UniProtKB/Swiss-Prot annotation:
Organism phylogeny: Bacteria, Bacillati, Bacillota, Bacillota incertae sedis, Caldicellulosiruptorales
A family per Pfam: YbeY
Cofactor: Zn(2+)
Name of protein: Endoribonuclease YbeY
Residues that, per the record, bind Zn(2+): H124, H128, H134
Keywords: Cytoplasm, Endonuclease, Hydrolase, Metal-binding, Nuclease, Ribosome biogenesis, rRNA processing, Zinc
Presence of keyword Nuclease: yes
Cofactor binding annotation: Binds 1 zinc ion.
GO CC annotations, alphabetized: cytoplasm
Compartments it resides in: Cytoplasm
Described function: Single strand-specific metallo-endoribonuclease involved in late-stage 70S ribosome quality control and in maturation of the 3' terminus of the 16S rRNA.
Single GO biological process annotation from the record: rRNA processing
Amino acid sequence: MKIIIQNQQDKYQIDESISKIIEDSVLNTLKIFMDDENYEISVMIVDNQFIKELNKHYRSIDKETDVLSFPIFEFKNGELQEDIAIVEEEIPLGDIVISIEKAYEQAKEFGHSVEREIAYLTVHSVLHLLGFDHIEEEDRMLMRKYEEMVLEGMGLTR
């Protein structure tokens, strides 16, 4: 498993503990759905302004958001929906963008730790890479089930 974490902001310190939370969140989410560890995910840590620009560019929504996910393959609820030819050691699953600034704001708003919020946002994003969505209520509840399962397994309950 290759997890590439890039810090593209300077408002908050990204130390080893934050990187470990992100890595553990990715690994614990993927192990529910994947049989092996030959995958790669890129995680970019940004501020609100940067994610707002990405949100406007890619989704035509001119406001900040907490996370964006850019999957490479088509999944539906954790199952690959297309055949892929493996040509690299690690199969890239996609890119995740997390606004660390928004994570701090939401942790304060929801009354839990920043660590829990970062873990939640990471798990949420990985699930999006795996084809989960929360537009329909049934899909939202399924996604929420997996989010809580991973967070509880990491000891990060509300």
